[in-house]
């Protein structure tokens, strides 16, 4: 999938999606049936007979995504697929990407020059300088422990509370007296910080089964959110 979409202007949505299948020698009707499944997957029902010029930029990119998935690749490669979109449509497509990844569970290589986009979409991020990888790690570890000064420049202004999950900053369970408040380890810090900061004691961090897997003191939230930010004063 590329930022310019690369759709064939004389073919409809359905024909564009079916095209790579037909190139592989799949029978026309089978390719059309598969293409229609992809149309539904990316939410373009009712637009399968439209031409690219009749679609918005976001819709065109959905066609590109559907076409790339129709051939069932082992590795899904996306080269700056959303960079040509305006901010609102770009966010919509990022959310759509996450939905598809959750549904399909594919290995994805996603190239972007937008660090915030990488943090939102990536399970592991490789930051490169002059063709050499400076750091390859999870988003949380890159934000909390940048390996080089070059990487640190990327992370200085990152709003940590919007990126990090509770599990990224929690402590191991201990025998301390805890607050009555419990928070999920999968919560983004921003979503629960206000509740945690009203507590005097550490809160319990729980997993999907309601089991306590860690603790978190309110002071850790303050340190995490403000401790690593660049001082502009």
Residue ranges and their predicted role:
Residues 11-18:
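Short coil-to-helix segment of the ABC ATPase nucleotide-binding domain corresponding to the Q-loop/switch region
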Residues 18, 22, 29-47:
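Conserved ABC ATPase "signature" region
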Residues 51-55, 59:
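Conserved ABC ATPase signature
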Residues 70-74:
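A short, proline-enriched helix->beta-strand linker immediately N-terminal to the Walker B motif
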Residues 76-79:
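Catalytic Walker B motif of ABC-type/P-loop ATPase nucleotide-binding domains
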Residues 130-131:
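Conserved ABC ATPase "signature" C-loop
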Residues 136-137, 145, 215:
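ABC ATPase "signature
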Residues 178-209, 216-233:
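The conserved cystathionine-beta-synthase
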């Amino acid at each position: 999938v590329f930022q310019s979409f690369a759709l064939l202007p004389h073919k409809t949505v359905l024909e564009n999606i079916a095209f790579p299948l037909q190139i592989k020698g799949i029978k026309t009707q089978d390719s059309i049936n598969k293409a229609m499944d992809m149309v539904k997957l990316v939410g373009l029902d009712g637009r399968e007979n439209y031409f690219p010029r009749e679609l918005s930029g976001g819709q065109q990119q959905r066609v590109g995504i559907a076409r790339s998935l129709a051939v069932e690749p082992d590795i899904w490669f996306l080269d700056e697929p959303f960079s040509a979109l305006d901010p609102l449509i770009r966010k919509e497509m990022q959310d759509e990407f996450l939905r598809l990844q959750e549904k399909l569970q594919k290995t994805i290589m996603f190239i972007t020059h937008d660090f915030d986009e990488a943090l939102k979409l990536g399970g592991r991020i490789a930051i490169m300088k002059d063709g050499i990888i400076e750091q390859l790690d999870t988003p949380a570890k890159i934000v909390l422990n940048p390996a080089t000064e070059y990487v640190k420049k990327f992370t200085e202004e990152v709003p940590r509370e919007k990126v990090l999950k509770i599990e990224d900053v929690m402590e191991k369970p201990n025998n301390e007296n805890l607050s009555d408040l419990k928070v999920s380890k999968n919560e983004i810090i921003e979503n629960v910080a206000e509740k945690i900061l009203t507590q005097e004691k550490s809160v319990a961090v729980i997993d999907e089964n309601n089991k306590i897997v860690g603790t978190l003191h309110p002071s850790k939230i303050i340190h995490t959110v403000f401790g690593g930010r660049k001082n502009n004063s």
